[in-house]
Regions:
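Long, acidic/polar, low-complexity amphipathic helices and coiled-coil-like
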Residues: 1, 5-17, 22-26, 31-41
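Residue position within the beta-strands of beta-propeller blades
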Residues: 5-6, 46-47, 87-90, 136-138, ...
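Residue-level signature of beta-propeller blades and closely related beta-rich strand-turn architectures
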Residues: 10, 50-51, 93, 141, ...
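Surface-exposed loop/turn elements that mediate protein-protein interactions on large endomembrane-trafficking
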Residues: 12-29, 54-71, 98-122, 143-167, ...
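Solenoidal tandem-repeat scaffolds enriched in leucines and small polar residues
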Residues: 37-38, 45-46, 52, 91
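Short regulatory "switch" loops immediately downstream of catalytic or recognition motifs
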Residues: 47-48, 88-97, 158-163, 187
Length: 212
């Protein structure tokens, strides 16, 4: 008799209902939007962007309370995932000359919901996920590293992916995903095609396919 979460496109709100149909309720505020929330351990973590800012909030489904976790003076901040009580997010720190963006740096952070501790996970990594209980980060060239969830400031392994990541893509697109104990990532295929590789923890290719 657990909960199933579902987003109502008609009402533009997140809801949940009991598996036996005995209870139905809205989850949090209407500001929780489709594609911008993650659920773990009774917490719904989501982002709200408006007026040039991004706010990351947490709704506790048991206490029915909403707390603000982080606020940024940019809309270039994204939640990457919620893993237990660990929140992985990224922020693009843009460099400007006047009102013109001339460059910038992507930074990943790990936030502990229990302690409120925030860890900076280095610069210039454009993709990140939690994979096999470790933090996986990599740059566009495929230079990758693993960090411990318990001590994220320590890099436990550095290596290179067999292929560079897909080029000419929006910074908000996900190019790396953990799939069970395996890792899937997008690379350049032939012409305009995208090649998806699925690798295991020993970096052996399990399968690959192309999409247009």
């Amino acid at each position: 008799n657990g909960w199933i979460y579902s987003y109502s496109a008609k009402d533009d709100r997140l809801a949940r209902f009991r598996t036996d149909g005995s209870q139905y309720e809205w989850v949090g505020e209407a500001e929780i939007k489709s594609g911008r929330y993650y659920i773990s351990n009774g917490n719904v973590v989501y982002s709200v962007s408006n007026d040039g800012t991004t706010t990351i909030k947490c709704f506790n489904t048991e206490k029915k309370t909403t707390d603000t976790l982080k606020t940024f003076d940019t809309t270039s901040a994204w939640i990457n995932g919620l893993y237990g009580n660990h929140l992985l997010y990224e922020v693009y720190d843009a460099k400007k000359e006047g009102d013109v963006v001339t460059g910038g740096t992507m930074r990943f952070y790990l936030y502990n919901l229990n302690s409120g501790t925030d860890y900076t996970l280095g610069n210039d990594k454009i993709e990140g996920t939690v994979w096999n209980d470790q933090i996986f980060l990599c740059d566009k060239a495929g230079n990758a590293e693993l960090r411990s969830l318990q001590d994220p400031m320590i890099v436990t392994k550095e290596f290179k992916l067999p292929n560079a990541l897909l080029g000419n893509i929006s910074t908000s697109a996900r190019l790396v995903l953990a799939v069970g104990k395996n890792l899937a990532f997008a690379t350049d295929g032939e012409g305009s095609q995208v090649k998806i590789l699925l690798m295991n923890s020993e970096w052996k290719e399990l399968t690959s396919f192309t999409v247009n």
